[in-house]
Amino acid sequence: MSQDKFVYPERYEIQEVCENFIKRRHLNQMMQEKGIFGISASTEELSQIMSNCIFDAVTIDDFRKNAIQCSNRNNLSGFLITSSAKDLSVKDIYEKARDNSNLKLSRQYRLGMLVKETRDGKDYFKGKLDYEIRRPGRIQFMDKETGSCEFYMFETKNNEWQVEVDGTRSSDGKEVQKLFTQLMDKSITRIHVLDIDCLKDKQTIEFFDEIIKRGLPDEWKFQDVVALTFRRGRDEVEENIENEDEEKSKTTPLTGIRQAILEGGNLRDNEFVHKFEENGCIFSAMTLEYQNASTPETIHIRAEFKGSPKIFEVSIVNIFENEGLEAKKEQSSLSVKKNLEVRTAFWNNARIIYNEIVSKQ
């Protein structure tokens, strides 16, 4: 698998990205880190200045990531790899596959180089996967459309590795999972995902209720549930089939409603939601509002079982900054690093909750 080639952008590309895709506050920060101060200049003027500068590869990558964040909503998903063999090294398996030009993989996967980084004093490896997107009834000019995502893998304990996927499509996490499924020896390894089908109906509600309590560390204070998706429970559907004649003589205000998507405030205590719970339902997605304890930042995090199969993923869908004496919420953004840190913390806490619930079955 060939090494990714760095191509320096054209001047107009830098100017266009700075002017239209990067938030002003991040543009100021990036300039100041390079010793350039232009606080009173317009965004257009700053973009022209930046286009005339020469930057290293790391800074260019920061431009790219910030621009992508402004135009896409990144989601984080992941899985665990365990093995009955001794000395499992997912890193070594991946690198051997990457260096093997004769290895045949589906989807025309391109495996990027692994980069060693550190999180909370612990080493991990960052990689990149490019893959071909296949669509039914493909249109010719879309033939070469590709997906791309970054992933992070680290050893949690002997013979156990965790892989986290930072992508812009729900399919990204599943593609990374498919890749490692092809690379691993299926007779001695298992891949564990957060799949809603492994939870009973009431356990899906327990899962999201625990997320409300334990989703993020104390730096972020939970405020409200601002969106909620739920549907009729699997247990209820099976019971209705078995007792179809009896059900025909009984009707409730919820008869015929199979799924509901609510947006607003105080949704966890909503009367309609409680009635649905009484009749048996599954929670599949929730958007939670958090307020930062030390800064005027407010975020909306969407926690969702999505796709087929429905795998758990996390995304930040809204970012606000409270401004003025009235603390009016204005649209804002987080740095790429902080955005990823928040999603990672949330997903890992959700993974702990999920495993606790599944272990009780």
Per-region residue spans from a language model:
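Intrinsically disordered, low-complexity, charge-rich terminal extensions
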Residues: M1-Q361
